[in-house]
A protein has these predicted regions:
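Conserved micro-motifs of the catalytic ATP-binding
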Residues: 1-6, 45-50
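Short conserved segments within the C-terminal catalytic ATPase subdomain
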Residues: 27-39
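Acidic ATP/Mg2+-coordinating residue in the GHKL
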Residues: 93
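Short conserved segment of the HATPase_c
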Residues: 98-114
């Protein structure tokens, strides 16, 4: 993404998330998955400056990771919120989660190859590398964490204004 110019425009984060959720649903999501969208601050209109197609790609990649890495199904919650001049996109699933070493590698910006281990465990790969690049060019941060009792939470925080 560093090779193509960023197409900056004013965007409504809730609409971005709605488009990504719709795109995944329209691709024919199996009944094993439950996909929900919520607003943390309903009625509070916020906008961000960013590239619509890149941010859509980021959200779709995060949602699809939940699907790919939970072949037996899971509940996926996509939420949008704002706080202190930032917008937060959260993608949370109640699937199998990831190991502590993988979580540490993800939170330390280590690239993880997309491979299936002998145990059958699939590691995250290129999709997250693309997500990281998109977050970076939007001057944001990304954080991975466990959810209780199991699952994964990914939180992307982007400034409401990019300078």
């Amino acid at each position: 993404y560093s090779m193509q110019p960023m197409q900056k425009q004013t965007l409504v984060p809730v609409e971005l998330a709605r488009q990504a959720v719709s795109e995944v649903l329209n691709d024919g999501l199996s009944d094993k998955y439950e996909l929900e969208l919520s607003e943390d601050n309903p009625g509070k209109a916020i906008t961000i400056t960013g590239d619509q197609s890149l941010l859509n790609r980021m959200l779709c990649n995060l949602i699809r990771n939940c699907i790919v890495h939970n072949p037996n199904g899971c509940r996926i919650q996509v939420s949008v919120g704002s706080c202190d001049r930032t917008c937060t996109f959260s993608v949370i699933d109640n699937g199998c989660g990831i190991s502590e070493p993988q979580l540490n590698r993800l939170n330390n910006d280590k690239d993880i190859s997309s491979t299936q281990k002998q145990t059958g465990e699939i590691e995250h790969g290129l999709g997250l590398k693309i997500v990281r690049q998109i977050v970076k060019i939007h001057q944001g941060t990304i954080q991975f964490s466990d959810t209780a009792p199991h699952g994964l939470s990914v939180e992307v925080v982007i400034p409401i204004e990019i300078y």
